[in-house]
């Protein structure tokens, strides 16, 4: 019985360790607006065009009543969507299946009751694409401001 319990604890801890490895998130000490503007500037300074900005918090607030949801998930939340033509082409020449990684996105959000700062997060690419794309995403996210917490 002890071995079974130990095995269960081991498996559970491994699952927790890998549960969020697909995502990189960091909290910065600046306001939502300043953080979002820093991300937008970082993208545009690299000559990359922003395709779309999804206003996630507004959408959830607007549609929540329609489905009976009352919990506020974000104070503010936006996802910036962009694409680097050269990087995307290189990535998809390596494997056309990497199309699922394009466009690239970085999310900026604040949580209710958390006054310490703003979160910046992005999906962590896997495989060969990670070597091509993750550096760009990390550089852009780093320009949001000094990190106060990461995961």
Summary of predicted features, one role per range:
Residues 2-7:
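Sec-dependent signal peptide recognition
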Residues 13-14:
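N-terminal signal peptide c-region/cleavage motif recognized by signal peptidases
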Residues 18-47, 54-57, 147-149:
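Terminal, regulation- and interaction-focused segments at domain boundaries
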Residues 21, 51, 75-77, 101, ...:
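Extracytoplasmic
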Residues 28-36, 53, 70-73, 126-134:
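Solvent-exposed, acidic/flexible segments
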Residues 55-101:
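Compact, glycine-rich, soluble single-domain proteins
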Residues 102-127:
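Beta-strand/loop substructures that line and gate deep hydrophobic ligand-binding cavities in soluble
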Residues 118-151:
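C-terminal partner/receptor-binding element of secreted or periplasmic proteins
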